[in-house]
Amino acid sequence: MCQHTQLIVREYRPEDLPALVRIWNEVVEDGVAFPQEELLTAETGAAFFAAQTYTAAAVDADTGTVYGLYILHPNNVGRCGHICNASYAVERAARGLHIGEKLVSDCLVQGRAHGFRVLQFNAVVASNTHARHLYERLGFTQLGVIPVGFRMKDGHYEDIFPYYHTL
């Protein structure tokens, strides 16, 4: 991705699925941010992304190349169903290019548009400092700390931080 690329964030399309699955699996394989351990296949990925309230892709407006994604869904049910949760993934080669900021900013808009009142992150890993700084810069509030709440790929445990943002 070059600096002149026009990046847009839009709802995913079926043709995005191979890239979405690949990017999601990169983050799962890294083992330092997502709690999932199982990789998505083409079939499980299609079902997974379709089951979300909203799935977005960050794409090059000219080429359609997908560089990142997010999923948005309820964090709970019933009386807490107005609180949503999201996960973000950026292709390894495109990290550090502020794609995450575009994804989170769009997610805040989509959360509101889908009737949610709060966006909550349950488990931001302590060592994920880039994400933590981004969330704080965008107005998220850290709720506390859950000691040794995340098992890293190498087997050691790290603290996790819940965050929220009113919509």
Which residues fall in each region the model found?
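A short beta-loop-alpha structural element at the N-terminal edge
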Residues: 7-20
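Conserved acetyl-CoA-binding loop-helix of GNAT-fold acetyltransferases
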Residues: 96-111, 132-137
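Hydrophobic pocket/interface hotspot
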Residues: 20, 24, 45
